[in-house]
């Protein structure tokens, strides 16, 4: 992917916001509980390497990623000795690569442990499916089989056991408690407790501090975003959003009544109006569903008109502006703010998706 340093569209990441969110979370954790920064999916769109550096500076004790490639990227970037856990499935043939790079892997099937050829010890975290329904063992019998299998191979180390809550970001807790009971039952079936027992993502840690166990997987809230709007007013501290998205007007013109813009001619001016073309489109993560949404221009709302194109978007201006004028898509301008939550609400999705969609074509600038 070619990063577009030569067009006026960019993301700003506020390192101080990330540091503040981590520090506020750490102040709530017992000293013996580790905070692991979840930097999967290019750090939820914030940039994996620079975010990891910032998180480590703030006191994060390790990292969680989704795939082995992300873990290797961290190792190659200089995180040589840091704890890294791959949360997703890894192919059996890649186990040795992980072992040689001291990367911990998630395991959720006993047969995956068969016929491994390892040149170094492999650290394993056993995933328990307590009700999420994706990956994980579901019974004490499976747990005992895996524990027995690991005991037969001196190269296998059962480093951790964990689960993931499906409803931690909801105020109603009955399903959460059901998952916890199932996880606890499987956990107590082990003859030897692993070093790391971890269940808490951002939502669980913020709302259910008793779930912290030995480590917390701090993800969405590290970036200053609420796990869900439902719990936003119940959070123990104010989150500081780290990401802002900006662009500039590359063309400004006046439409006459009857003039149309963009594909399908879905927008037609009914009177004289000023419009601007922005150098950002759905290839950058500003998907077509943003049509009809709004941005900030000089602190005023300006609607997106017509269809969002692959590389360009058109907005209706409140008045004439100069080419090169700044446009805020996510962020604050003259005291008014558009958040990732606002965009998610318009799109009918969640803030995670809004930032994860932002492609590598957009350069990230790190401030503070």
From Swiss-Prot:
Q: Which GO terms describe its biological process?
A: D-alanine biosynthetic process; peptidoglycan biosynthetic process
Query: In what pathway does it function?
Result: Amino-acid biosynthesis; D-alanine biosynthesis; D-alanine from L-alanine: step 1/1
PROSITE patterns in the record: ALANINE_RACEMASE (PS00395)
InterPro entries to which the protein is assigned, alphabetical: Ala_racemase, Ala_racemase/Decarboxylase_C, Ala_racemase_C, Ala_racemase_N, Ala_racemase_pyridoxalP-BS, PLP-binding_barrel
Its catalytic activity?
A: L-alanine = D-alanine
Instruction: Tell me the residues on which N6-(pyridoxal phosphate)lysine occurs.
Output: 40
Keywords tagged on the record: Isomerase, Pyridoxal phosphate
> Which enzyme class, named as a word?
isomerase
Its GO CC terms are: cytosol
Catalytic site positions: 40, 263
Required co-factor(s) are:
pyridoxal 5'-phosphate
Known EC number? 5.1.1.1
Specify the domain of life of the species encoding this protein: Bacteria
Annotated residues that bind substrate are located at: 134, 310
Family per UniProt?
Belongs to the alanine racemase family.
Q: What does this protein do?
A: Catalyzes the interconversion of L-alanine and D-alanine. May also act on other amino acids.
Q: What is this protein called?
A: Alanine racemase
Which species is listed as the source? Listeria welshimeri serovar 6b (strain ATCC 35897 / DSM 20650 / CCUG 15529 / CIP 8149 / NCTC 11857 / SLCC 5334 / V8)
Q: What gene codes for this chain?
A: alr
């Amino acid at each position: 992917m070619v990063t577009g340093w030569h067009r006026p569209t960019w993301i700003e990441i506020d390192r101080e916001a990330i540091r503040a969110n981590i520090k506020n979370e750490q102040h709530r954790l017992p000293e013996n509980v580790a905070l692991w920064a979840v930097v999967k999916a290019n750090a939820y769109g914030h940039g994996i390497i620079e975010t990891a550096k910032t998180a480590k500076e703030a006191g994060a004790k390790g990292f969680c990623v989704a795939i082995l490639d992300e873990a290797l990227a961290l190792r190659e970037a200089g995180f040589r000795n840091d704890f890294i856990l791959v949360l997703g499935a890894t192919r059996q043939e890649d186990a040795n690569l992980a072992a040689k790079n001291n990367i911990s892997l998630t395991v959720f099937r006993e047969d995956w442990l068969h016929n491994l050829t390892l040149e170094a010890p492999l650290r394993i975290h056993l995933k328990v499916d307590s009700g999420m329904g994706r990956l994980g063992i579901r019974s004490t019998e499976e747990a005992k089989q895996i524990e027995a299998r690991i005991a037969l191979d001196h190269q296998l180390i059962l480093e951790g056991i964990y689960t993931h809550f499906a409803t931690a970001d909801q105020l109603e807790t009955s399903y959460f408690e059901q998952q916890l009971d199932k996880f606890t039952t499987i956990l107590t079936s082990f003859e030897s407790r692993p070093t790391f027992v971890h269940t808490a993502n951002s939502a669980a840690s913020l709302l259910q501090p008793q779930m912290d166990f030995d480590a917390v997987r701090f993800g969405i809230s590290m970036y200053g975003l609420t796990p869900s709007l439902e719990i936003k007013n119940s959070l123990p501290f104010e989150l500081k959003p780290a990401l802002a998205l900006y662009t500039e007007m590359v063309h400004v013109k006046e439409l006459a009544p009857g003039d149309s813009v963009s594909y399908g001619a879905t927008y037609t001016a009914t009177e004289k109006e000023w419009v601007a073309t922005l150098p950002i489109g759905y290839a950058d993560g500003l998907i077509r569903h943003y049509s009809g949404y709004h941005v900030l221009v000089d602190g005023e709302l300006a609607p997106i008109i017509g269809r969002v194109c692959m590389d360009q978007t058109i907005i209706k201006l409140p008045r004439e502006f100069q080419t090169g004028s700044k446009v805020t898509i996510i962020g604050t301008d003259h005291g008014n703010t558009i958040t990732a939550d606002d965009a998610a609400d318009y799109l009918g999705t969640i803030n995670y998706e809004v930032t994860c969609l932002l492609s590598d074509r957009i350069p990230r600038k790190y401030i503070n």
